[in-house]
From Swiss-Prot:
Keyword Cytoplasm in record: yes
Function of the molecule: Microtubule inner protein involved in the attachment of outer dynein arms (ODAs) to dynein-decorated doublet microtubules (DMTs) in cilia axoneme, which is required for motile cilia beating. Functions at the initial step of left-right asymmetry specification of the visceral organs.
A GO cellular-component term linked to this record: cytoplasm
Subcellular location: Cytoplasm, Cytoskeleton, Cilium axoneme
Pfam families listed in its UniProt record: PIRC1_2 (PF14892)
Top-level taxon in the UniProt lineage: Eukaryota
UniProt-listed GO biological process terms: axoneme assembly; cilium movement; determination of left/right symmetry; establishment of left/right asymmetry
Alphabetical list of InterPro entries matching this protein: PIRC1/2
This protein's UniProt keywords: Cell projection, Cytoplasm, Cytoskeleton
Protein name: Piercer of microtubule wall 1 protein
Species lineage: Eukaryota, Metazoa, Chordata, Craniata, Vertebrata
Family (UniProt): Belongs to the PIERCE1 family.
Amino acid sequence: MGAGILRVIIMDSENYVETHPSDDNEAMKTSDVYKVDKNLPKRFNNPDCFQGYSTKINHPFYQTSSQIYGSKRPTVHEMPTTFNGSYRKFSEHMLKSGMFRDNGFNTSIEKSKITGHDTIPMFQDRINFNYAYDSGNGPKN
């Protein structure tokens, strides 16, 4: 008899824990141990699909605890039991409207290090501002 997997069954309603040794070599799923959501993606129900993130082996003296933790495969106890997908409401709005631009009234003069100390940068006018990079002397009017 080889080293089998210790299978744990947890019943939430009674707080009852039952353990059974498993002789078969089938992979343990999250749904075997915990009650999972019906909309849980398959990758969260099967932790064996994650192989760990570290492929390069470092000297143990220079390894951090995060590298050690990230190199190991997750167990069923570390996998999520529910999945709440994010809404794309903000992204869709930003796609249609664009990023926020501050077009407020500025009362102070902003000096630019690129065009020189005696010129005022023109942030909104990209075409006229770009040629200041070539000459280094600032906009010529």
